[in-house]
Curated annotation (Swiss-Prot):
Residues 159-168, 182-200 have a biased composition (Basic and acidic residues). One of its GO terms (cellular component) is axon. The gene is ngdn. Its main location: nucleus. Part of the small subunit (SSU) processome, composed of more than 70 proteins and the RNA chaperone small nucleolar RNA (snoRNA) U3. Belongs to the SAS10 family. The keyword Repressor applies. The lineage of its organism: Eukaryota, Metazoa, Chordata, Craniata, Vertebrata. This is Neuroguidin. It comes from Danio rerio (Zebrafish). It is found in: Nucleus; Nucleus, Nucleolus; Chromosome, Centromere; Cytoplasm. Keywords: Cell projection, Centromere, Chromosome, Coiled coil, Cytoplasm, Nucleus, Repressor, Translation regulation.
C-alpha cells in the first residue's frame, strides 16, 4: 500500500508537467509540418533553386533528420513499455551525435560565408558594413618589373620553372595534430564553471580528503606490514653504480627504463614536500578558484652566440 501511495504521488506531481510538454510538442509538430509542406510545394514549383546547394548543409540536415527519427522511435518504444537494450537505434544515435560534434568546428568556420551567401541571395548585394568592402585591391599587387626584365628572367630561369612545376602537383599531406575538444562556442562563464568542476574533482581525489574519509569512516582500517624488496634492490644497484663511477672515473649511461624507475621513486618522495599544503581543497571550501587550466608560460632561454675560437697552426 505504501509503494502504491508513493507511486500515485509521483504521478500526480509529474502529470501536469507531462501534459504541458505534450501540448507544446503537439503545437510545434503542427507548426513544423505546415512549414515543411509550404517549402515542399515551393520546391516542386521551382520557386527555389536547390541544384547548387552546399553539400555540407545537406549532410548536416540529413543527419539531424535521422537523429530526430531515431529519437521518435525510442520515445514510442518507451511509451509502449518495451526494453531498449541492444537496440540498433541507440547505436545510430551515438554515431550521428559523434559526427555532428566533429562537424561543429567546420560549421563555425563556414558560418560567415554561408550568412554572406544567404544575405546576398535575399537582398542582391552586400551590406555596407561587410568586411569584404575593405579588402585589398588585387590590381595594386601587379609586379612593377618591365617586360624586358621579365623576358630575361624567363630566359635564365626557364629550367628552374620547369623543375618547379612538378612540385606544384604534389599531393598535400595535412600536418598531424593531436585531437582536442572543441570549445569555441563556450562563453567565459561556461569555461569558469568547467574549471571549478575540474578543481572539485581534483580536490576529492586529494590525499587530504582521502585521509579524512578514512579517519571518519566506520569501515575497518586495513594495515599492511610488508617490505619493499624492489626498492631495496634499486637502492643497492644505485649504490653499486655510484661506487663504480667514482672508482673508475667514468660516467655510465642510463637506459630509458632506469630513468623511468628513478622518476617514479622521486615522485613518491616528492609528496613529503606537499604534506602541509591545503590549497588543493579550496574548491570545496568556497575559496578562490585558481586558474589551473591556463598555466603561466615558461620563459624561453635565449642562448647568446659568442665568438668562435680559432686555433692557429704552429709554424
Amino acid at each position: 500500500m505504501a509503494a502504491t501511495a508513493v507511486g500515485n504521488d509521483v504521478i500526480d506531481r509529474d502529470l501536469p508537467t507531462a501534459v504541458r510538454l505534450l501540448n507544446s510538442l503537439t503545437e510545434q509538430i503542427v507548426s513544423v509540418t505546415s512549414h515543411v509542406r509550404e517549402l515542399i510545394k515551393k520546391v516542386r514549383e521551382k520557386a527555389y533553386q536547390t541544384s547548387k546547394g552546399l553539400s555540407f548543409l545537406d549532410l548536416r540536415y540529413h543527419l539531424l533528420l535521422f537523429y530526430l527519427q531515431d529519437i521518435t522511435h525510442l520515445i514510442s518504444l518507451k511509451t509502449e513499455g518495451e526494453s531498449l537494450k541492444d537496440n540498433s537505434a541507440i547505436h545510430r544515435l551515438v554515431t550521428i551525435r559523434t559526427v555532428l560534434e566533429k562537424m561543429r568546428p567546420l560549421d563555425q568556420k563556414l558560418k560567415y560565408q554561408i550568412d554572406k551567401l544567404v544575405r546576398t541571395a535575399v537582398t542582391g548585394s552586400l551590406s555596407e558594413n561587410d568586411p569584404l568592402h575593405f579588402r585589398p585591391n588585387p590590381q595594386s599587387l601587379v609586379s612593377k618589373l618591365s617586360e624586358s626584365e621579365d623576358s630575361d628572367d624567363d630566359g635564365v630561369g626557364g629550367k628552374t620553372k620547369e623543375q618547379k612545376e612538378p612540385s606544384g602537383g604534389r599531393r598535400y599531406v595535412p600536418p598531424r595534430i593531436a585531437p582536442m575538444h572543441y570549445d569555441g562556442d563556450l562563453t567565459e562563464a561556461d569555461r569558469q564553471k568547467e574549471r571549478v568542476e575540474k578543481q572539485k574533482r581534483a580536490a576529492l581525489r586529494s590525499s587530504v580528503i582521502q585521509e579524512l574519509r578514512q579517519q571518519y569512516s566506520d569501515a575497518p582500517e586495513e594495515i599492511r606490514d610488508r617490505r619493499d624488496f624492489q626498492t631495496d634492490r634499486q637502492g643497492r644497484e644505485e649504490l653499486n653504480r655510484k661506487n663504480y663511477e667514482e672508482s673508475m672515473m667514468v660516467r655510465l649511461s642510463t637506459t630509458r627504463d632506469q630513468k623511468l624507475r628513478k622518476r617514479g621513486m622521486m615522485g613518491m618522495t616528492s609528496q613529503l614536500s606537499n604534506i602541509t599544503r591545503f590549497s588543493d581543497i579550496t574548491a570545496l571550501t568556497g575559496g578562490e578558484v585558481q586558474d589551473i587550466g591556463n598555466p603561466k608560460p615558461k620563459k624561453k632561454k635565449i642562448i647568446k652566440k659568442g665568438k668562435k675560437k680559432v686555433f692557429r697552426k704552429r709554424k
